[in-house]
Amino acid sequence: MQLGHYLFPVVHGIVGLAGFCFIAFLISENRRAIRWRQVFAGLIAQIVILLMLFLIPWFADVFMAINAVVQTLMRATLDATGVVFGYIGGGSLPFAVTPTGQSSLMILALQALPLVITIAALASLLTYWGVLNKVVQGMGWLLKRIFDVGGALGVGVSSNIFLGVSEAPLMIRPYLKQLTRSELFTLMTVGLAGTTGTVMGLYVAILSGVLGKMGMMHVISAVLVTIPAVITIARIIVPEVDEMTEGRLAHQHEASNSVEALTLGAFEGGKILLGIIVMMIGVVALVKFIDKGLALVHFGDLHLSMTGIMTWVMEPLVWLMGVPGNQMHIAANLMASKVVINELVAFEKLGVVRHSLDPRTELILVYAMCGFSNFSSIGILIGTYNALIPGRRAEYVKLSFKALIAAVLCTSMSGTVLGMFYGVLPSM
């Protein structure tokens, strides 16, 4: 009985991983060119990475230390916004509030999101000192050895652990024109499936009520497990048929000293912050506008909405992830919010509905929703590549929607792998 209790999620997870690969197979450009041995290796790598992260004791210690640093940065940033904006930025309240009204005083744009500026400044400083560059180079070398990807793609993929859709391609800018179609698709997919070191801290802040002190460990784990998933799914949808592109780290920091690096990073963080706010307002407003139009079309008591339609699409995916039947609709709705709007809104909603979900489902969804795979990110993706490689516009525009589908499959696979071992691994 006890063995069956632990065995069923593993079997369901294997079925789920096979299901996601089958979906990718259905939209593959060249099914005969798929190298199934590499696909299988990618699936095994996801499981191995997760087990290593949670079974090797010092891994947990490292992530707890990182989490402590992030918590300190969060408190320092909140102190700074309190100084600048007063109580609306997290400073002392000049009036009394009831406990029920306390939550309404949380202003996302002025209290949680400014953490982006702090981490961007720190990341810029670490890049100038060469610390971040060495980490990225090491990851690129590791990916090349394990997954047999070209050196340029290895650096590009590993860069996405720390950088975003628009920043990571700059690390291999001289090689972008030379990338094969499969490599370009993989780079686009990892940009949408991944997140950034800057935003990881923001995830931890928003999910503090769900993840507690294990927040940073789970967020980083979700990002790392997604990397082999990206290579797996991308190689199914757009198999490699050309010679891989070699390359090395080519990014040079434009600052001439540490102070300038810190300043440039802070301003860059400000641009990212403004971009997040603008995109959230624009996308949420557009979705609400379309929803109001769809509300005019109804069948009896059934009213249409973009999120509602996407919820129906997501229900089979959350089943493949291993979400119980009685929680599938809520989970699918959260995934739909993540794709239609963004993961920040979905994480906020998760905090509201979490009492209707069991802890395992909560964690599966956290892993599945980590990443930039949403409609607005396609605009950022196309805008970035349009500036960097305008000569390949027709190619990356055509691949962009497939990259979004692939990214959703990849993050869903991360949630599936987590669900397979939930309750077995000690740190969960």
Q: What feature does the model see in each segment?
A:
Residues V223-I272:
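Long, contiguous bundles of hydrophobic transmembrane helices that form the permeation core
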Residues L51-I88, M244-E246, I290-V313, N326-L334:
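Interfacial/capping segments of alpha-helical transmembrane domains
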Residues R75-R145:
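Hydrophobic alpha-helical hairpins/lids featuring a short glycine-rich hinge
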Residues Y6-A18, Q111, L304-S305, L365-S377:
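Structural signature of hydrophobic alpha-helical transmembrane segments
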